[in-house]
C-alpha cells in the first residue's frame, strides 16, 4: 500500500503543469540609440541607432541600423548583414544580438554576442565581446563597450 501511495504521488506530481521559464519580448525597438567602441585595425567610438519590430515573443527584427560618426573614422564603418535580437532562455537580464559591421579596414565582421539587459532602464550593455570576420582570413572585431538605449522594449 505504501508503494501505491508513492506511485500515485509521483504520477500526480508529473501531471502538474510545469512553469515555463521562457523569456518574452513586447513593445518595439524603435528609437534605439547609443554608442559603441569597436576595434579591429583601429579603435573607434561610433553612434549607433536602429528601429525594430518584435516578430515573435523571442525575436526582434532590427531594421535601419545606422553607424554614424562619434569619431571621424566612423564615417567608414557601416552596418553589415541582417541584425536581430533574441531572448536568452531562463535569463531576463541577457539578450543575444546578431549584428555586423564593415570596418575602417574594409574587413567586415558578423556574428552574435550576448549583452546585459536592464529592463528598468531599458538599456543594453555589451562589454568585451568579439565578432568573427566574414572572411576566414580576416581579423576579429572587438566590441570593447556598447551602451544602447531601447526605450520601448520590454523583456519579461
Sequence positions of predicted segments:
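Predominantly extracellular/secreted and cell-surface proteins with exposed
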Residues: 47-121
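Gram-negative bacterial Sec-dependent N-terminal signal peptides
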Residues: 1-21
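Short linear motifs in intrinsically disordered/low-complexity regions
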Residues: 22, 29-31, 92, 119-120, ...
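Short, hydrophobic/proline-enriched secondary-structure or compact coil segments at domain edges
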Residues: 29-35, 95-99, 125-126
Amino acid at each position: 500500500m505504501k508503494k501505491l501511495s508513492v506511485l500515485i504521488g509521483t504520477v500526480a506530481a508529473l501531471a502538474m503543469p510545469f512553469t515555463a521559464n521562457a523569456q518574452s519580448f513586447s513593445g518595439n525597438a524603435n528609437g534605439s540609440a547609443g554608442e559603441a567602441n569597436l576595434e579591429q585595425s583601429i579603435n573607434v567610438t561610433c553612434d549607433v541607432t536602429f528601429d525594430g519590430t518584435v516578430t515573435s515573443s523571442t525575436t526582434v527584427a532590427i531594421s535601419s541600423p545606422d553607424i554614424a560618426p562619434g569619431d571621424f573614422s566612423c564615417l567608414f564603418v557601416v552596418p553589415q548583414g541582417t541584425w536581430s535580437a533574441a531572448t536568452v532562455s531562463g535569463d531576463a537580464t541577457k539578450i543575444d544580438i546578431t549584428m555586423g559591421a564593415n570596418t575602417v579596414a574594409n574587413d567586415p565582421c558578423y556574428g552574435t554576442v550576448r549583452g546585459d539587459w536592464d529592463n528598468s532602464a531599458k538599456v543594453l550593455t555589451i562589454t568585451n565581446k568579439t565578432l568573427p570576420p566574414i572572411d576566414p582570413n580576416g581579423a576579429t572585431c572587438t566590441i570593447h563597450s556598447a551602451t544602447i538605449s531601447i526605450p520601448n522594449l520590454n523583456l519579461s
